[in-house]
């Protein structure tokens, strides 16, 4: 339950009446923004400690000065408090919490929940919504190689559902014995499920068990004189034994380790996670963070909560976790919560010896190397930000940059892209595209005006306008942005700047214009601020081009059908519902198209001819 929702917050009264139960507390500033989330076994003691006398680091003192309100949520146990704390930190990303950002979104193999499931791969945490997950895999290439291997051994379908549902005869995969063709009923549910069960064991690393099971099925089929079936199992064994010779081995759970190394330097920290199976590193992952005012134990605590209490998907959890040396007493409660969530006991090793020590040293060396790369890149980026701030004569540091670019195809399918850079670098999740409507063909000025107007309108409402807005273009384009700023009265809130190639159109010789200033500026092509302008502009250009190409492709496919007399919106929708997409429709035969409700044989012939 939320204890405090009042606007007039009385801190003294709040602290005096706090509960001693376990729970989560949220610190809010005067704008109502959550600036810190924490958990406690005893909320009264923990929250009061922030306001009591005693030594506190500068970061905590700065945070306490900004607290305008506190909210708490009581939880049934310490375990639920850890889970809620972790979810709230990921949701709100408070500025005084230690925040982790994966260096990439890892791929997983997924077995879908269909009656006849398909095996495919997806990136990131959305994978678990699709079905049963296996992974994560180190790279896209590794997961694709596994898919290829699976297809050679287990004839489980990999096709999209839209393609699967549209089949009236087996596809090529069936002919080359890489699919059982459940789409046209050539395999029973029991036979398909048997293959699926063996595949799941294979993906879980139970290699010997898979070999034994297939061998038993082969001999049983032979005894029953089902020789074709026995041959299928024999072929599977041949491929599996070849893999065995390539040193694919069983995963023994007591020999699975997660090794977590931390390296700290100045106000930065890097965490390296090595996943070990049977003496081999099967995956390595890294996180680099700003860690001002934090020690190794607090960083380890935050990381363990982030990684093990979050939505990480793994079919094999480690029996052993090796950690860089930290204060054990400070993380024992968290360790118990992690074991409870995973559903198994974990052997926590904080002072490893012998063989285990070499893994920890390897993780710490990896963490150090990644931190060196991170700090070097961050230093260069900060120099560019500082240089741009100086050129634009800004008083405050630049926290957010947005850049607009327009792309169209021969005046049609106009797209405006907006890319976002923060003081931490490119923020891909915040990139946006705008479909530009109701303007004359090829009118870039009107497109810029519309896109900037829509962005400013939403930005004022959400209170998230950028510090700097870059417009790709020259005087004409920046004048359109200026007009929007005048309409909304924000001339002094956001610095506009445009970057155009000028008459010569030579890269590195771009002309620069500042908002409400007709002076034409040029900067040395090696100037850090100029390099940042070009970097952001090029990113916006690429983002616009990709969006515009998608739109052109969709428009072209749709227009093919629209030209056929008798195919209106309802029939177009029926075709898409049946086939799942234009690509599947283009592959369909006349008879297959005629199966769609409302499509006659004659109309099906006309539709087929459009694609052939």
UniProtKB/Swiss-Prot annotation:
GO terms for biological process: nucleotide-excision repair; SOS response. The keyword Zinc does not apply. Pfam families: GIY-YIG, HHH_5, UVR, UvrC_RNaseH, UvrC_RNaseH_dom. CDD domains: GIY-YIG_UvrC_Cho. Residues 208-243 form the UVR domain. GO terms for molecular function: DNA binding; excinuclease ABC activity. Keywords: Cytoplasm, DNA damage, DNA excision, DNA repair, Excision nuclease, SOS response. It is found in: Cytoplasm. Gene3D superfamilies: 5' to 3' exonuclease, C-terminal subdomain (1.10.150.20), GIY-YIG endonuclease (3.40.1440.10), UVR domain (4.10.860.10), UvrC, RNAse H endonuclease domain (3.30.420.340). Its main location: cytoplasm. Residues 20-98 form the GIY-YIG domain. One of its GO terms (cellular component) is excinuclease repair complex. HAMAP family: UvrC. Interacts with UvrB in an incision complex. Belongs to the UvrC family. The UvrABC repair system catalyzes the recognition and processing of DNA lesions. UvrC both incises the 5' and 3' sides of the lesion. The N-terminal half is responsible for the 3' incision and the C-terminal half is responsible for the 5' incision. This is UvrABC system protein C. It comes from Francisella tularensis subsp. tularensis (strain WY96-3418). The gene is uvrC.
């Amino acid at each position: 339950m939320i204890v405090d929702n009042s606007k007039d917050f009385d801190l003294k009264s709040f602290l005096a009446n706090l509960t001693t139960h376990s729970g989560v507390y949220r610190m809010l500033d005067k704008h109502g923004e959550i600036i810190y989330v924490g958990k406690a076994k005893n909320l009264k003691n923990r929250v009061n400690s922030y306001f009591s006398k005693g030594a506190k680091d500068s970061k905590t003192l700065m945070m306490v000065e900004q607290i305008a309100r506190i909210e708490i949520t009581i939880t049934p146990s310490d375990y639920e408090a850890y889970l809620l704390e972790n979810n709230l930190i990921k949701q709100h990303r408070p500025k005084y919490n230690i925040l982790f950002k994966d260096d990439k979104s890892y791929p997983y193999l997924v077995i879908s929940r269909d009656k006849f499931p398909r095996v495919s791969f997806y990136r990131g945490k959305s994978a678990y919504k699709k079905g049963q997950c296996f992974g994560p895999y180190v790279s896209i290439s590794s997961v694709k190689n596994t898919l290829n291997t699976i297809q050679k051994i287990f004839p489980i379908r990999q096709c999209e559902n839209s393609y699967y549902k549209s089949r009236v005869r087996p596809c090529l995969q069936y002919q080359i014995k890489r699919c059982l063709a459940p789409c046209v009923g050539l395999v029973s549910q029991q036979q398909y499920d048997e293959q699926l069960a063996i595949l799941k064991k294979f993906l879980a690393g139970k290699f010997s068990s898979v070999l034994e099971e297939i061998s038993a099925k082969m001999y049983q089929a032979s005894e029953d004189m089902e020789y074709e079936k026995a041959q299928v199992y024999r072929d599977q064994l041949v491929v599996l034994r070849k893999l065995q010779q390539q040193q694919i081995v069983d995963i023994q759970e007591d020999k699975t380790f997660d090794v977590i190394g931390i390296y700290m330097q100045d106000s930065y920290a890097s965490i390296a996670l090595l996943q070990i199976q049977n003496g081999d590193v099967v995956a390595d992952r890294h996180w680099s963070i700003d860690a001002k005012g934090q020690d190794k134990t607090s960083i380890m605590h935050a990381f363990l909560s982030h990684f093990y209490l979050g939505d990480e998907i793994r079919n094999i959890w480690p029996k052993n976790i090796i950690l860089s040396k930290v204060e054990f007493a400070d993380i024992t409660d968290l360790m118990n919560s992690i074991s409870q969530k995973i559903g198994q006991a974990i052997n926590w090793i904080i002072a490893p010896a012998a063989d285990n020590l070499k893994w920890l040293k390897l993780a710490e060396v990896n963490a150090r190397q990644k931190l060196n790369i991170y700090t070097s890149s961050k230093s260069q980026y900060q120099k560019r930000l500082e240089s741009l701030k100086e050129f634009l004569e800004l008083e405050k540091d630049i926290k957010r940059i947005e850049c607009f670019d327009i792309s169209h195809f021969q005046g049609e399918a106009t797209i405006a892209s907006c890319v976002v850079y923060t003081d931490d670098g490119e923020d891909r999740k915040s990139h946006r595209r705008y479909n530009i409507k109701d303007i004359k063909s090829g009118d870039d000025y009107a497109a810029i005006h519309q896109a900037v107007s829509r962005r400013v309108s939403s930005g004022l409402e959400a209170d998230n306008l950028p510090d700097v807005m870059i417009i790709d273009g020259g005087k004409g384009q920046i004048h359109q942005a200026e007009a929007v700023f005048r309409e909304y009265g924000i001339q002094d809130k956001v610095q506009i700047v445009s970057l155009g190639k000028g008459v010569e159109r030579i890269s590195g010789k771009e002309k620069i214009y500042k908002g409400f200033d007709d002076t034409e500026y040029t900067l040395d092509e090696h100037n850090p601020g100029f390099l940042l302008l070009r970097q952001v502009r090029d990113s916006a250009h690429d983002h616009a081009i990709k969006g515009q190409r998608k739109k052109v492709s969709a428009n072209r496919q749709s227009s093919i059908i629209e030209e056929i007399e008798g195919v209106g919106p309802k029939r177009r929708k029926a075709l898409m519902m049946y086939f799942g997409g234009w690509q599947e429709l283009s592959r369909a035969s006349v008879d297959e198209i005629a199966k769609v409700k409302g499509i006659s044989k004659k109309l099906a012939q006309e539709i087929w001819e459009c694609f052939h």
